[in-house]
Design a protein with these regions (language model features):
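Bacterial N-terminal signal peptides that target proteins for export
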Residues: 1-11
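Bacterial N-terminal signal peptides
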Residues: 9-19
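Mature catalytic domains of secreted/periplasmic carbohydrate-active enzymes
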Residues: 24-359, 364-372, 377-379, 383-387, ...
């Protein structure tokens, strides 16, 4: 699922942004759309890979597979969604067509689809079934439609293929309800030129609010960008605004990684590649905890079910995340003002604001007795832009009679989780050392998480 080679790496974009701080006023003026704000609040989604590859022990289909191999005799989208819901994910993106060109809906554009499979005598619709089941379980639904098509001969003619691809997109965008996200993956496309402007125009005709995932090569059209690696980690300070050819735009990061190491599709006898719970928790800390969206790859097997081991791991993952963040110690603070309480109430719909026009501020939290904690979770209110450029979490050192830093970084963004060795204090503060405009803090939370002192740097 690597993106087009002409797309600029995300790390490069971060560097470009850092270089643009000399124009901090422009940076602070860039704001997200309401759709981007709502999407970032989802935080965690799942992308589903299921196609002829599933039945042939393949990762990269070449378009030669006979549709007759596709026959998931125990297909149960409700079982998929139950497992995904248990993980804590909020949305699902289905790979409706991967690079092999096989379509999971009864498209009118090609016979290379489930219409020619034995499943349901060619009368089934995986996309429709998955969309309905996702919404049944409270999950938002989106689709991935690969531009690269290794089966259809029209791919050799850019004009003919654009017409074909746009017709497929029109079917998906007009028949399956609201789409939370549309994934553009350019893997394998090489020098092929697509009419991306028309692709986005077609999508927007039917889905004006869909979040388009792409990368900076589609800067004019994409709403979110690739992290630059399939590790599911954000290895850099995460800024939502990036500079592309002198233009600043709000482009939050989505970080994709498969549940089974290196495999997006299911393969038999491959349970050993299932990621451990600890690895998934570290991934969460370094994606969601670094202000990015986590997109976890889940692969149904050739029965049409999420494998039991994968479903169990997803459930464990969801339970562990919920347990970790069940006891917010900041709720035990001594109340001082309604303004301060807005960042300490556990309600992300309220926020504390630094003094108007300020570039430095502190949010101090006092407790009736010392608390011990090893994790701080901070969220910016981003509707007016990402303003914090440098911050620190500090405790009052009674013996030294001064504030002591226990964590520091630059970006906060949607959510920043800082971890450190356990400390004990009755006074804690968030020190906004530099901001392009007054800081807005949705949440400042503190936790003691056993066995998690080193999961995120």
């Amino acid at each position: 699922m690597k993106l087009l080679r002409q797309f600029a790496p995300a790390a490069t974009c971060a560097a470009l942004l850092a270089a643009s701080f000399s124009s901090a006023q422009n940076f602070s003026e860039i704001k997200p759309s309401p759709q981007q704000v709502a999407w970032q609040d989802l935080e965690f989604g799942v992308i589903l890979h299921f196609s002829t590859n599933t039945f042939l022990d393949r990762e990269w289909g070449d378009g030669s597979a006979d549709p007759k191999v596709f026959n998931p005799t125990q297909f149960d989208p409700d079982q998929w969604m139950q497992a995904i819901q248990a993980s804590g994910a909020k949305y699902v993106v289905l790979v409706a067509k991967h690079h092999d060109g096989f379509c999971l809906w009864p498209t009118g554009q090609t016979d290379y689809s489930i219409k020619k499979s034995p499943w349901k005598d060619g009368k089934g619709d995986i996309v429709g079934d998955v969309a309905r089941s996702a919404r049944k379980y409270g999950l938002k639904f989106g689709v991935y439609l690969s531009p690269w098509d290794r089966h259809d001969p029209r791919y050799q003619d850019p004009v003919a293929y654009d017409k074909y691809y746009l017709s497929e997109l029109e079917e998906l965008a007009s028949h399956y309800g609201d789409l939370v996200e549309f994934w553009l993956d350019g893997a394998g496309s090489g020098g092929h030129v697509y009419d991306f402007k028309k692709i986005i125009e077609t999508l927007r005709t039917y889905q004006p609010n869909t979040l388009v995932f792409a990368d900076t090569g589609l800067f004019e059209y994409g709403d979110a960008r690739w992290v630059g690696t399939e590790s599911g980690r954000v290895p850099y300070e995460n800024w939502n605004v990036i500079d592309r050819h002198g233009y600043l735009r709000w482009r939050p990061v989505e970080a994709d990684t498969p549940l089974r190491d290196l495999h997006w599709f299911w393969h038999p006898n491959d349970d050993k590649s299932l990621k451990s719970l600890d690895e998934l928790l570290t991934t969460y800390d370094q994606t969601v905890g670094h202000g990015a969206q986590l997109m976890l790859g889940v692969a149904p097997d050739n029965r049409g079910l999420i494998p039991d081991s994968d479903a169990t791991r997803l459930k464990e993952f969801g339970e562990a995340i919920r347990a970790r963040y069940a006891h917010n110690l900041a709720l035990e603070h001594i109340a001082t003002s309604a303004e301060q309480a807005a960042a300490l109430d556990g309600d992300p719909d309220t926020f504390w604001s630094a003094p108007n026009g300020s570039h430095h501020a502190t949010l101090e939290v006092n407790f009736p007795r010392p608390i011990t904690f090893n994790r701080a979770l901070t969220m910016e209110w981003l509707n007016d832009g990402q303003h914090v450029q440098k911050y620190a979490v500090e405790i009052w050192d009674v013996q030294a009679s001064k504030w002591k830093k226990i964590a520091e970084a630059q970006a906060i963004g949607h959510k920043k989780i800082d971890t450190f060795t356990p400390v004990t204090a009755s006074r804690v503060r968030l020190n906004i050392e530099s901001s392009s405009s007054e800081a807005h803090i949705r949440e400042f939370q503190l936790y003691l998480i056993h066995g998690a002192e080193t999961t995120a740097p």
